Regions:
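NAD(P)+-binding Rossmann beta1-loop-alpha1 motif at the extreme N-terminus of oxidoreductases
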Residues: 1-56
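NAD(P)-dependent Rossmann-like dehydrogenase/reductase catalytic/cofactor-binding core
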Residues: 1-8, 29-30, 168-171, 178-189, ...
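Amphipathic alpha-helical segments at domain termini/boundaries
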Residues: 9, 23-26, 35, 71-91, ...
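Structural motif
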Residues: 12, 20, 79, 95, ...
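Acidic/polar active-site rim loop that often engages polyanionic ligands
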Residues: 30-31, 87, 150-160, 232, ...
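Structural/interface elements that position substrates and couple domains in central-metabolism enzymes
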Residues: 34, 183-184, 196-206
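Rossmann-like NAD(P)-binding element
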Residues: 42, 56-59, 63-119, 127
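Rossmann-fold dinucleotide-binding core
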Residues: 119-189, 198
Length: 298
């Protein structure tokens, strides 16, 4: 199979990343997309989020007509059935919760229901591709395709090769990334966090230490990195936008398994925040609010 043979893509997960990936695939790639989520409510929320972004950032700014937006939205449909989502897919793109047992369960279902030629990809930012692939009968077509958040602005895509992933599939996913106007970098899967998040993990830990030590507020730390280092978003702004604080807490056991207890453990400030309900993302409150409402008063 070649890139030109990919016509229909299933996106599994309609949250912050899944809906952005669906938008990119339809808007930039021109693909037919079936977006799966667990309930009718979350399916609608994910598709509505795409429409809201297109309207706000393109139609209302004169960068896109309403007819063009309607065409993009017309290529995206939603479902609560995994079998329905993947049955005609040439590529399955998983963007669900960052827990290994959840991903293994999903990939077993993809393997059973997707066409024999379909490539099975995951948007994981850290999980081992070889371990995910081992639950399928087609490990040679299981691959990581990690988009960075926000998907529309960030050019980087990490293409993550499992031990048994074929070179042909790696090339095809790199070609797809380029078609979507992204810059692919190929890496091996035995680095937990791959390239970006392994480096970012160390930086984030230091930034969180500075907040805990009251060196500066999260807002000011972000300001230094955005203005001083020309980052589009600071680490705290990014965590609040994506809801990553909750994800880090959920995936702590996997991180410890890969990194060991010292490097893999959750930062205590994240643990305190998440326990108090400050997870960011669609839940609204993250570390900015936690600082303003709680930590700055300690």
């Amino acid at each position: 199979m070649e890139l030109k043979d990919i016509k229909t893509i299933a996106v599994i997960g309609g949250g912050t990343m899944g809906s952005q990936i669906s938008e990119l695939l339809s808007y930039v790639g021109g693909y037919n997309v079936t977006q799966w989520s667990r309930s009718d409510e979350t399916v609608k929320r994910g598709i509505d989020a795409i429409a809201d972004r297109l309207k706000k950032f393109y139609v209302e700014k004169g960068k896109m007509t309403q007819d063009e937006m309607n065409q993009i939205m017309g290529r995206i449909k939603g479902t609560t059935s995994i079998e329905e989502a993947v049955k005609n897919a040439d590529l399955v793109m998983e963007s669900a919760l960052e827990k290994m047992d959840i991903k293994k369960d999903l990939f077993q279902k993809f393997d059973a229901a997707a066409p024999a030629h379909a490539i099975l990809a995951t948007n994981t930012s850290q999980m081992n591709i070889t371990e995910i692939a081992a639950v399928t009968k087609r490990p040679q077509v299981v691959i990581g395709m990690h988009f960075f958040n926000p998907v529309s602005r960030m050019k980087m895509v990490e293409v993550v090769k499992g031990t048994l992933t074929s070179d042909a599939v790696v090339k095809m996913i790199c070609d797809l990334a380029k078609k979507l106007d992204k810059e692919p970098v190929v890496c091996k899967d035995f680095s937990y966090g791959f390239i970006g998040n392994r480096v970012y993990r160390a930086l984030r830990w230091e930034a969180l230490d500075m907040v805990r030590e009251r060196v500066a507020s999260p807002q000011d730390i972000d300001k230094v990195l955005k203005i001083g280092f020309n980052w589009p978003m600071g680490p705290f702004e990014l965590g609040d936008f994506s809801g990553a604080w909750g994800t880090y807490a959920i995936s702590e056991a996997d991180a410890i398994k890969e990194f060991g207890p010292e490097k893999g453990k959750l930062h205590p400030l994240i643990r305190t925040m998440v326990r108090a309900g400050y997870t960011g993302g669609r839940h609204g409150k993250g570390i900015y609010a936690f600082w303003d409402e709680v930590a700055s008063k300690w």
